[in-house]
Amino acid sequence: MTSFVKVPAFFISNQGRAEPCSSADVFRSKRVSAEQWSSTSISSGRQVLADLLKLAFAVIGLLSPVTACGSEPTSAASSQASVKSRPNIVIILADDLGYSDLGCYGSEVATPHLDSLAANGVRFTQFYNTARCWPTRAALLTGYYPQQIHRDALPKLPGGSQGTRQPWAKLLPELLKSAGYHSYHSGKWHVDGPVLASGFEKSLNVRNDGNFFTAAGNLIDDQPVTPAQDESGYYSTIDTIDHAIECLNHHTRSHSDAPFFQYVPFIAPHFPLHALPEDIARYRDRYLEGWDTLRQQRFQRQRDLGLVQTTLSPLEREVGPPYAFPEALKKLGPGEINRPLPWTELTAEQQQFQATKMAIHAAMVDRMDREIGRYLQALRSAEVFDKTLILFASDNGASAEIMVRAGGHDPAAPPGSAKSYLCLGPGFSSAANTPFRRHKTWVHEGGISTPLIAHWPGGITSQGALRHTPTHMIDLVPTILELADVTPPAEFEGQPVPARPGKSIVKAFNEDVGIDRDSLWWLHEGNRAVRVGNWKLVAAKDTPWELYDLTNDRAEQQNLAAELPDRVRELEQVWQKQTDSFEQLAALTQPVRTPGGKKAGKK
């Protein structure tokens, strides 16, 4: 029987120590450049990846209970030498990217630049998000669960879904200022408050996520953009990296002796499925074999790469989109379906329509990787690549949503063009989330599991290694603060600042170690879960708890709730105590709805 530790009160410091877990035979692959990857075809690139990353499994045991541990305080007045020694930090975030959508996580999609980062860095196999875009961004940039800071709802505080953070819940750029960092934002925001007021010095706020082919609605440094009269060459994924490179060049010219933090959150591959015609052409008809076959193919690659120790979850044929939009189905025509039916039962028209949507999704991921490659080259040209920590992740799992909004959908328009409005849907979303169950908004593994790639030549000596310890978006702020040698303020206006629940994962960069923590906790729109060690209690909205032993069942197939009712009660108490603690903290301040929050809700 696993022993569970008491969930700490929200004002208790709970900085955890990382202890070695079970030994792992970590294969160190040779360094591989993006240029080498680019010279291969999609199919041969996958074989090269499998050959390079012959990685063994690490057998992860139950996490150890938390032990009280605090870091040594550091002075805000750092020496110039100390400032120079701190790494630059780059966080790249995809939007609605599935766990298996990158080549280095099992995909057939060509992602040579991210694959190269993985081959020369480390990949985390059990990294989690919050299941939705805006709660994940709050967790990533503050180090708190979003429910603690009015950025997602609680049972007794439903008004906190997209409220204004408490003033003590500072974002990462504000915390890094004391260490001499300059911070820049390029891409989606979806956080409360103006960007520049949050510590960023320059910003491109890509707000018009209803059309990838126009800059209308975007903000530069919190001011509206005037779109060019001719936007025929505009595509938001390219524009995001154009701005990121401009910020990097500005920093190199103006602050070359200081470290920088760049936050690059793409909109891609979020719906609407919009991609450049030449990118779509690379994947045209690639997916006519269907989602059932694609899941099997990706799962086999994941097994070959040592990423998973689970079975492949069967498709849940009756689980469709999380929200019903019957009018959208009428507008989209007979090719659209809202269930992941057996591929052989679809009509030829439906198969072509669905395969085309997946081709556009793949094209969006492909283009994102190409633009990341352009940014990586800019880092090399600025001679800062080796001293820059790059973290790549996704805000939630792939989306099963089907809807039509913004400018609507023209059935006569080429799929993927500005006048089309397509969503991936539950069939190929299930393939993108291979090998897990469910999708974005759910807190089963498919909704909350994301790749995490960490690359830092100056600090990560492992090459191509896997990290098996469960980690979460809330861990990134403590990790970065440790590397920057920053101790966050203990007080705000004379009151104690609540301890961040996340843990630094710095030690895991070079060792496959466990991270001490009580639990990991989830709640979104009634979907709820808690993980303690390898035990996970999870339930969809208005359904009973399910219990899984994730040691060999991350596919969440063997529900043990009926067999182990005591375990269910024990884990439910952990979940409830954490929930009560968050409600007590959040209730101290009144959540204020942010402007535009209602519109932003369904993302």
Language-model features, listed with the residues they occupy:
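Formylglycine-dependent sulfatase
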Residues: 61-63, 69-541, 545, 552-573, ...
